[in-house]
Amino acid sequence: MSLIVDILIDDLRALIRDLGQNGGLMSPSVYDTSQALRLYPTPSEEHVWPAVNWLISQQQSDGGWGNPSMPLSRAVPTLAAILALRRHCQRRSTFDGLLEAKRFLRRQLEYWEKPLPDNLPVGMELLLPYMLEEAYREEHQDDIDDVPIKLRLNIPLAPYRELIALGEHKRSLIQQKKPRAGTAPVYSWEAWASHADPELIDGSGGIGHSPAATAAWLFAANHNPNLRNEIAGAENYLRQASLATSESAPCIMPTAWPIPRFEQSFSLYALVTGGILDFPSIQDVLKPQIADLHQALKPRGIGFSDDFMPDGDDTAAAVAVLIAAGYPVDLAILNQFEREPYFVAYHGELQPSISLTARAVHALDLAGVDISRWWKIFIDAQKLDGSWSGDKWNTSWLYTTCHVLIALKNSPYKTAMKEAVAALQVHQHPDGGWGIINRSTTVETAYAVLALQNLREAGLLDDDDIHMLQRGYNWLCIHYRPFRMKEYQCWLNKEIYCPQRIDRAYELSAMLAVTLGELKL
């Protein structure tokens, strides 16, 4: 047992030391890569084709792009990929793939005829109408020289009626507010603006910390000599952003970058959920990170980078970490994100988030605040099968359920928690792991193990539940590879993505929580 502890601690120490380096790590994005290829490709052909080939390799067997577990997240990357690949269609197989993508979009229309759910991907009400407009514009612009094929999509707009109306409302609100650089609306700049305003460039050198928005801004700037310095900075931003992905290839872009505070606050929060923040062997690398997080937390909160506006999710994670580490924190910093009955990431949000609210409530619980008034929110949101799902920031119900159970573990709602444990029991795969795609994944198994370990420490598990926990822990041990991060995309933004270091922090925290817990018994 001591050997695995030593290995896990060494791995965790290396992870903590690297948090926030080079702006953070992020999985590659189909949407942002497609937009960069379409709107502002690198002039070097040797860099374009790796991105084209990568895009082609990401197409699913049903013809679409994106994770099949989240159908509503797939239309935007699929449309973006179609429009980008039309310009680079030199093989019959690519053309056949585009035809399949066209059929996929037709089949997907049924999802958009239903009422819109709360877990729409970020900016979907802006991005999908924008991509539909772009597709319509290109189809009726026959003189586009760099489009070798004409692929008539002929997508009916009626099924998107509710989304388009929501988008028009959102655009009008944005235009009234005239957003500043480094604010949430600018993250989706490409969907509501067309004038290359240099005032919107933030400290990263890009637009809204978004490769897609930055590529669109560069396209709009059209090599304007009066914007020479700004254009050079934005081009450098795209080069640096491409280095943040696991592909590390020019033109292959993440969905957001830089994300150092998101990576730092959420990774350290994962340690809090595992109860290992005070473990002696990590303090020399941990304390500088926590001290850095403390100085970064301002009265308005903290964002996913120092150059982006504060949000409630990163703020809740940071506050929880600092309180758990013994730092004094003014809770007004967190409470400003409360909008009855939830906590919000950004003021003016249209959909609430259960996971964000759970994290904020957990932070308040750590601070000794009476959190009983929030318990009923979680109980009312519980599904009939005992789980919590439908969150706007993560597609996995295991993520949401994990964080709600941690927020509820000191509550009197034992029946609700037992029902959630029963849901975990039902959905555990025969191999002992968990995953929403009919196979076990590391990060989702880590969520389940962390939830169960927290309930075990609260005395809420029976022998069968502990056996379930042990099977999940064994699965993590069998599939653990020291110093090698896995990539499974279940976080939700403009499209589904994976912040690798954060997921690794959850994995290591889950394994250490159980391992150290066993040593205490």
From Swiss-Prot:
Its cofactor is Mg(2+). It catalyses: (2E,6E,10E)-geranylgeranyl diphosphate = (+)-kolavenyl diphosphate. The keyword Membrane does not apply. Keywords: Isomerase, Lyase, Magnesium, Metal-binding. Its EC number is 5.5.1.29. One of its GO terms (biological process) is diterpenoid biosynthetic process. It is an enzyme of class 5 (isomerase). Mg(2+) binds at residues 311, 313. A motif (DXDD motif) lies at residues 311-314. It comes from the Bacteria. GO terms for molecular function: kolavenyl diphosphate synthase activity; magnesium ion binding; terpene synthase activity. It holds the Pfam family SQHop_cyclase_C. Belongs to the terpene synthase family. Involved in the biosynthesis of (+)-O-methylkolavelool. Catalyzes the conversion of geranylgeranyl diphosphate into (+)-kolavenyl diphosphate. The Asp-Xaa-Asp-Asp (DXDD) motif is important for the catalytic activity, presumably through binding to Mg(2+). PANTHER family: (E,E)-GERANYLLINALOOL SYNTHASE, ENT-COPALYL DIPHOSPHATE SYNTHASE, CHLOROPLASTIC. This is (+)-kolavenyl diphosphate synthase. It comes from Herpetosiphon aurantiacus (strain ATCC 23779 / DSM 785 / 114-95).
